[in-house]
Amino acid sequence: MSQVRIPVVPLKKRPIIGLFFYFRFSTLEIPPGELSKFELLLTHMSKNRYQYNPAAQLQDTQVESNHFVICDAAFESLPIPEAYSELFNRSQVHWVIAGEACKSLQRAQEIWQWLDTVNATRFDTLIIIGGGTTTDLGAFVASTYKRGLNFILIPTTLLGMVDAAIGGKNGINFNGIKNAIGTFTEPSKITIDTSWLKTLPKRELLNGWMELSKHALVGDELLWKELGNLTPNDSDINWDKLVKAGSSIKRKIIESDFRENGERKILNFGHTIGHALESVATVSKTPLDHGFAVGVGMIVSLQWSAHLADDASNKSELRDASDQLKKWLINEANGDPWCWSTSQNPSELWPFMRKDKKNTSNAVLDIQLIGIGEAHWDCPLEKLDFEMVWGAAF
């Protein structure tokens, strides 16, 4: 079993959630606030349930292994939560310009070279701080350098906290295909601290809101109803509560299907179409955020699910959900990404959907919602049906 070689400092009221997958142990650390009320959701590995301050662990103790930091370059100028400032002062840091462009072999090679230059060994620890693209890249590098370094993920975006950092997936893009090269490797720890959300611009909250909505749509009808009464930029949102709910949905699913052979596939809801949009955007050099693309993908997939539904009430419920997503995307973002996305020709998206890594043979497989909170995976989507529901959606 791989473990981070950093001493644990026991403190009160600082629970962690253990995740145990394929002989690799990960801990989900919950800093102070409402998240400190997390119940211990897993009873495996009880001897590893420590209570401690993740920041103090690094700054107040003698570290047995070297630790190196990969961080989103935005934090060279943005304020960093005070608890983490000493970590930066004591560490060698490699700054990464976040965004889909960073998920490339070239950027991975640059970090491998940096790790070689600083003499990192396989017993050292890589601490990866940033949003989804930064943690995707950093985790891929960590999982491959010298056959695997210990690594800690500290997601700083809502998207990272509820989705990207959880589940052991990492990857880079290749030949225009999203996440074409990557591994399933669990981090040693995941530290979720919603104080990072104070650093986010409006559009980044919307990105994470789309992934949070996805979790609710495929797995929690009550959470979906709660989200329907909110907007991502409400000033009084209880982020601790929502992050807990969203991350718990994903955690429960991946416990039973870590390598995505079955139920975990439902977490790809909206992603087949969303990834195709991102690929077209990359080719045309059009800025398009992942969460926004997934939101558009979910709108279309909900229309498809409504088209296939036998029950009239389910049809109505699914179309209402599609309209709710549309409302958020239109109201919470500027018009450019919406106008660009909805003006795309579905026949130009189809070749990228055919190359999606989730497909088998020549079929495009998508996720169909039977109702809110209930999803089926590996559902064949025909090109004519896709073009029809794309038109109906917009």
Regions found by a protein language model. Give the residues of each.
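ATP/NTP phosphate-donor binding region
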Residues: 40-125
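Glycine-rich beta-strand-to-loop/alpha-helix junction loops that act as flexible
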Residues: 98-99, 129-131, 269-270
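Short glycine/serine/threonine-rich phosphate/pyrophosphate-binding segments
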Residues: 133-140, 276
